[in-house]
């Protein structure tokens, strides 16, 4: 994303034992030390491809470290986590951090019309037909049938698998090590290849790519059922694994990754998280060759999406070196799109229903548009401190964030006036006023609003137009929301606000949840 950027790496996780994938995680003190080193080194952007605990802002070392980075003009881009699609799983929910979900790209690898996603190893792909055998049929005497179906270690009979293609099932969860370790079992059993089939509850038509120790085809549940029907229809099932072809411009895309963590924000549902989504499925990434037997492999996760956005932030910082972290974040969020390349709403991982802002935040990132957003929602550290004061914290704890002994919480602070690029209203009682400030970072222009209100909610905006006569001019506007609360859904409902001058599009999602009756 930022081809001439200088990269500096800081180690935070000292407890990963590769290649067994037994991960304990990072200690907060190591995370904080890495951030302080980055701050001292004068980096411009921090990529944090690691999920934090959903603890209170003031009780979390990552929250404190990222706040200190923001104070020093460094924006942190962090992964929303891979605990989706369940609601309320989004991590790194700090308002001064740009959190990122993961979605697909418009590229697939296919072979003879069968779509699959695969790490292409250095060895030649065998083109002839080989016998197929399922993990269950390859079970070693005394092993559990379920374990053998999943191709778990110690469950497969080498004498039954050597020279064949082993068919393994997924455990019904999206965990990279399941797929990888199954391929290791296949390799150690002498298989010439593996077919890995995902379970239905992950999302039909959805597959991932991970590191494979043998040549591998990964199938969705639907395609897997077709394969198993074929296997059961003949006494001698055979298959071949052919080389891949690269297809671009696939529609529809993006589609949300089912693993991508979702909102609402468990720390504070008044702040929408994740903030945006970016390419995070089947990404060609650099890998340590001593572990993955190659310098490159296909990877999936919000840890892959996060660097894409960090690169965008670095490019914005290069073009606009005087912008605050909030301005850079706003530019990325307000230019993101909730539509796919068919012009339709981004679909969820099941491919049949529309995703919501709890999956994609403000939308899928648009790098070129983010360089010239027109307007930004700007903030500084005191805006974030005022936000924290709304809870309220103990003053001694607050000093860990501010290090400003003269700072005192305001007498009152309305979170609806927090100048965030997205708008969330919880415990809505039928009337609410939201205040925002927009700063002109482009040429003079007149912006007019376009509102798509959440169902059952009426929204008025004041003033009706925003006329900017010069750069850096700031204009305050208000949204006035009204609804018949007795007839309003108590579920989360969604809308949007767009300010446009015919060239720039400054979009904010609107999320409303009525107070429980």
Role assignments for model-derived ranges:
Residues 1-517:
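Loop-rich non-cytosolic ectodomains and luminal regions
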